Amino acid sequence: MLKSLTSQGLVLYNRNFREDDKLVKIFTEQAGKRMFFVKHAGKSKLAPVIQPLTAANLLMKINDDGLSYIEDYQDVVTYHRINEDLFIMAYASYVAALADASLQDNQPDPALFAFLQKTLELMNNGLDYEVLTNIFEIQILSRFGVSLNFHDCAFCHRTGLPFDFSFKYSGVLCPDHYHQDERRCHLNPNLPFLLDQFQAVRFSELETISLKPDIKKQLRDFIDLLYDEYVGIHLKSKKFIDSLGDWGSILKDKNEE
């Protein structure tokens, strides 16, 4: 049975279906993730609103047992800076894919919807897309059932010390308790400090981000380890991000010719 619903929606991806139809995966604020069928997509009035990472207020027919349909739309938001930059687009696509992977279909999650939308908005506003992605990755871990402690020592619970991370205890150790895990990570102490900040930061309060390239590289490598150990998903969009270093070198060489 189809039911009418008006809700904010964000297109996660689309794919071809038959000759000129499309299946469009949309994360809606009120009805969760749904798959929509769009007939004759290239000629449809819906064409502007079914592109990936496009947001709009959608009038929909929701089907709990199959494909849903878009009847109309208004207030379309396109993220121009994201769409014009290969690198930002890659990271934006990755956070959208992470949100998709963390949530079952048809399950409303307005908080996650708002978090994803705000992440894309800040990327589009020019904030550091790599660090925004790191923050998103850390805060969304709980939706994969992962709880990590970067705030206080797993043994004495003291704070504000040069911590190191222990996979054995899923948390940090202070210098007095480094010996509790001979296989601790030997991290730069700045990383646990930053990850503790990332867990707590609210994007509504975030105006600027500035980290040195070497710290960003260390964060990227360590968060990859966390995801390999605790989450175990391998997204195509993440593999593309991992290849961006090569793309960057190619583009830089072309610009210098």
Swiss-Prot record:
Keywords of this entry: DNA damage, DNA recombination, DNA repair
Keyword Heme (UniProt): no
Superkingdom, natural source: Bacteria
UniProt entry tagged with the keyword DNA damage: yes
GO cellular component, one term: bacterial nucleoid
Alphabetical list of InterPro entries matching this protein: ARFGAP/RecO, DNA_rep/recomb_RecO_N, NA-bd_OB-fold, RecO, RecO_C
Disulfide pairings: none
GO biological process: DNA recombination; double-strand break repair
Pfam families for this protein: RecO_C (PF02565), RecO_N (PF11967)
SUPFAM superfamilies xref list: ArfGap/RecO-like zinc finger, Nucleic acid-binding proteins
Function: Involved in DNA repair and RecF pathway recombination.
Family: Belongs to the RecO family.
HAMAP family, A to Z: RecO
Name recorded for this polypeptide: DNA repair protein RecO
Gene from which the chain derives: recO
